[in-house]
C-alpha cells in the first residue's frame, strides 16, 4: 500500500511467542492458522512471507484460514485472491478455508438458491457490517440501483466467478489431532457435534448467536471447561477481537482450552498466525497501519 509521496507502507512481524498446549495436533502435521484479516492484504502478505520461511518439521503442512477475510478493510478481493494461492506459496499440502460470520452474510446474500427474502435480509446485514467496501471493488455503479432488489441482482451478476468459487469451498470447521479450528467458537452447554452440525445457511433471522459456530461469543469466551476441554478439544478461533478486552493473555486462554487469533486488524493494524507442531504453538503478530491511517494516506 502506498502513501502520498510514493512511500510504501509495509506490514511486518513484530512479536513471536511460544506456548505449550494441553492438546496436540496430529503428530505428522504442522498447522499454520491465520486469524481474521478483514480486507488487509498487507497483513496477509507479512504472515505468508513468515510462513514460507519456516523450515518444514513434519511430513505434512496444512494452512487454515479461520474466516472473516472480507469486509471493513480496503482490499477484500485482493485478500481473497492472495488467500486462494496461499497454500502453494508456503508449500502446504492442504489448505482449509473456514467460513466466518462475514462470509456467511456474503454467501447468503449471493447464493442464488437462497429464498429471495432471506437473501435480501442477508444483504442488508452484510452491507451494515462492512460489505459495501467489498461490493465497490467489483461493481461500478454508473447509476445507483433503485432499491435493494435491484442492488442484489446487480451484485449477483457482477460477482467474479473466482470469488463465488472460493465462497463455495469454505467449511464450518476442521480438526487435527485434538485441536478444533472454527471461526467463532463453541457453546460449552451444547453437545459439540450437534453444535458444529448447525447449517451454515441458516437464515439470519433464525440465528441465535450463542447457538452458531460462526457467531458465538458467550458463554464460550467466559468458559473454564476443566481438564476435558471442549468435548476433548482445544479450540482455535477468531471472531471476537482480543476477547473484547484491552489486554488479553494467551496463557489464560490456553488454560481454558482455546486460542483467539482475532487481533482486530482494522482498528489495531494487527493480525495473528499460529504455528502448531504437536503440543507446541508459536503465535506470531503482524503489524501494519490501522484502517484509519490507510484512509488518511490514500486521500
State where each predicted segment sits:
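N-terminal active-site segment of His-dependent metallophosphoesterases
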Residues: 2-82
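A general structural motif
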Residues: 28, 58-61, 92-94, 177, ...
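Residue-level marker for buried hydrophobic side chains located in beta-strands
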Residues: 31-33, 63-65, 97-98, 180, ...
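Divalent metal-coordination and catalytic microenvironments
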Residues: 36, 68, 83, 100-101, ...
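Active-site environment of divalent metal-dependent phosphoester hydrolases
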Residues: 39-42, 71-74, 102-107, 188, ...
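Active-site neighborhood of divalent metal-dependent phosphoester bond hydrolases
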Residues: 73-171
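Acidic, His/Gly-enriched loop-helix segments that form or flank divalent-metal centers
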Residues: 142-259, 264-269
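Binuclear metal-dependent phosphoesterase catalytic core
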Residues: 254, 258-299
Amino acid at each position: 500500500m502506498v502513501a502520498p509521496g510514493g512511500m510504501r507502507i509495509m506490514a511486518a512481524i513484530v512479536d513471536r511467542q511460544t506456548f505449550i498446549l494441553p492438546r496436540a495436533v496430529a503428530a505428522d502435521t504442522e498447522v499454520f492458522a491465520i486469524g481474521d484479516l478483514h480486507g488487509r492484504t498487507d497483513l496477509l502478505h507479512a504472515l505468508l512471507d513468515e510462513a514460507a520461511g519456516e523450515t518444514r518439521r513434519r511430513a505434512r503442512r496444512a494452512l487454515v484460514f479461520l474466516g472473516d477475510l472480507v469486509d471493513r478493510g480496503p482490499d477484500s478481493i485482493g485478500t481473497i485472491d492472495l488467500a486462494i494461492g496461499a497454500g502453494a506459496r508456503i508449500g502446504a499440502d492442504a489448505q482449509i478455508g473456514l467460513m466466518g460470520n462475514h462470509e456467511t452474510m456474503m454467501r447468503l446474500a449471493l447464493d442464488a438458491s437462497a429464498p429471495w427474502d432471506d437473501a435480501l435480509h442477508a444483504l442488508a446485514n452484510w452491507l451494515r457490517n462492512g460489505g459495501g467496501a467489498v461490493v465497490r471493488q467489483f461493481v461500478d455503479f454508473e447509476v445507483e440501483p433503485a432499491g435493494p432488489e435491484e442492488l442484489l441482482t446487480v451484485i449477483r451478476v457482477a460477482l467474479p466467478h473466482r470469488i463465488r468459487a472460493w465462497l463455495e469451498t469454505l467449511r464450518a470447521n476442521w480438526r487435527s489431532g485434538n485441536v478444533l479450528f472454527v471461526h467463532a467458537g463453541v457453546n460449552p452447554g451444547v453437545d459439540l457435534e450437534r453444535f458444529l452440525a448447525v447449517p451454515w445457511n441458516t437464515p439470519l433471522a433464525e440465528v441465535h448467536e450463542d447457538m452458531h459456530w460462526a457467531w458465538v461469543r458467550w458463554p464460550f469466551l467466559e468458559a473454564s471447561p476443566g481438564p476435558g476441554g471442549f468435548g476433548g478439544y482445544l479450540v482455535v478461533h477468531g471472531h471476537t477481537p482480543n476477547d473484547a478486552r484491552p489486554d488479553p493473555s494467551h496463557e489464560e486462554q490456553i488454560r481454558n482450552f482455546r486460542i483467539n487469533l482475532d487481533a482486530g486488524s482494522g482498528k489495531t493494524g494487527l493480525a495473528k498466525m499460529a504455528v502448531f507442531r504437536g503440543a507446541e504453538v508459536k503465535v506470531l503478530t503482524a503489524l501494519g497501519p490501522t484502517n484509519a491511517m490507510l484512509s488518511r494516506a490514500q486521500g
